[in-house]
Amino acid sequence: MKKYFLKRTSLLLTILGCLSFACTNHNSETGKGKWISLFDGKTLKGWHGFNKTDTIPNWTIEEGAMVCLGAAADAHGGDVVTDEAFENFELKWDWKISPGGNSGVMYHVVETPKYPAPYETGPEYQLIDDIGWPEKLEEWQKTGADYAMHLPNEKKKLKPVGEWNSSKIIFNKGHVEQWLNGERIVEFQAWDADWMKKKADGKWKDYPDYGLAKKGLISLQDHGKKAYFKNIMIKVL
């Protein structure tokens, strides 16, 4: 009996060891806790047009940057999204826009024909020419804002149009941080009473599914002007 017990124990430990190894490999492959590149600097692999399965006509590669050509006639049709969905993450990227430019980075985007554009579900880190935009901008429309929800603070330091900026979004179990050029400029808790009130009282009151998804795609916005992105990295939390 003792010998049989030892054999069973040894077999169980071996199985557990294999499972542990498999789980470790799975985490390594999915990049949990490690930085994963979402853009290889050469191709659009890993991205596709929102609600599209064909090629991406509005985007190209220039000098290692993913470039939006600004070919969309309006805010619909030219946005791209990742092939993979993310829940809790730290996302960082470098970006610049053209004079009078407007773009954004969205997360937790739900992709179905029900939604004409990513912004109907995905919160947006706003990117825009704060100075050269042809119309007066409200603070919630300016670069670094959690668009139409939370304003950037006094630590915001935006580089001139045409120069590279660095941005970051951290989403971890509803706690959200937005960073610009090394400074945390926005911080809030998704889905709390304050968040719900902002949604109900503002631009998103007519978009019932805005910001509710807990997992979704990352999206880069085409809003009619050239925008440049590189060093797009994500770490699953």
Task: Describe each PLM feature range.
Residues C23-L237:
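Carbohydrate-interacting regions of secretory-pathway proteins
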Residues M1-G31:
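Bacterial Sec-dependent N-terminal signal peptides
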